[in-house]
Amino acid sequence: MKYLFTATILVLLTPAGIIAQTMDTGVHKILFLGNSITYAGNYITDMEAAYTLWHPERRVSFINMGLPSETVSGLSEEGHAGGRFPRPDLHERLHRILKAVQPDIVFACYGMNDGIYLPFDQQRFQRYKDGMNWLHDTLVKTGARVIIVTPPVYDELRAGATGYGAVLDKYADWLRLQKKSAHWEVADIHYPMKKYLDAHRTLDAAYGVDGFALAADGVHPGEAGHWIMAKQLLLYLGEKKAAGYQGIKNIMEQHSNGAGILQLVAERQNFMKDAWLTATGHTRPEMKTGLPLQEANTRALEIGRKITALLQQ
């Protein structure tokens, strides 16, 4: 019964308000900016795998430049990471990223870390708004299509920072308002994730259990959470067929080599994100050193040929 409930909710999460904007055929590079949730990259892998299966004739690079702990507000809580280092600030590295990648589309998802896990404060909120305005303006000047993504949901039951869920609601609401007031492109993942979480909590309460978590630690989504993110962004890009699928595995099952294609896409994503981060530089310690970018690109091309071969079988 719970599986049926989950499947039903995943289908119902397709918001009627999403306006499909099919991706232009001239798009070759999609850049993803964000924090540790983006760095984990499952939603990017899901998007790339689905897009590859649906558009085998296209060659689009999904470039993950997420950096754990990062903010656009420039704020960092006292004792962050056990006092080992402050949160990195996107201001320090964005110009290098844009010069190196020269993207056609940019998805930017910030907010989870920007309130630094404290109750709502107008000054912190202003720092977030200032950071997002700077980010949007900087990206627009490059000529890229800019899609701002609302922050994922925060689960207070699992994470423990009481009131922080409401903080992210405010941050997401402000971003959504920019669609009308500033004519931004804004893709909402916050409220679809919140709707899914609330529905499961209602079911848990009805059965007297406390078993569901969209993110085990309340912050970093698991497989279902990343799929909700991927699904909303695919729909935003005009991929209407994403609405009917409960997860990436259901999509890949439509091809006899789907599982192998997904595995190769994930493998390529995992080494390319570290190669890009190392090549463009950042201030966050304790990160894996990536392959030299030229070596990583050569390896990525080899994987691309394998994917093409599997698609044609």
Protein language model annotation of sequence segments:
Residues 6-16:
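Bacterial N-terminal signal peptides
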Residues 36-39, 67-73, 105, 112-117, ...:
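Solvent-exposed loop/turn segments at secondary-structure junctions
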Residues 156-191:
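Substrate-gating cap/lid alpha-helix
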Residues 26, 42, 182, 204-313:
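Conserved catalytic region of serine esterases and O-acyltransferases that act on ester linkages
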Residues 19-69, 73-76, 84, 94-102, ...:
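Serine-esterase "nucleophile elbow" of acetyl-processing enzymes
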Residues 33, 45, 74-77, 84-126, ...:
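Oxyanion-hole/transition-state-stabilizing segment in secreted/luminal serine hydrolases
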Residues 1-4:
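Positively charged n-region of N-terminal signal peptides that target proteins for export
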Residues 140-145:
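A short helix->loop->beta-strand "cap" motif at the edges of active sites that frequently abuts
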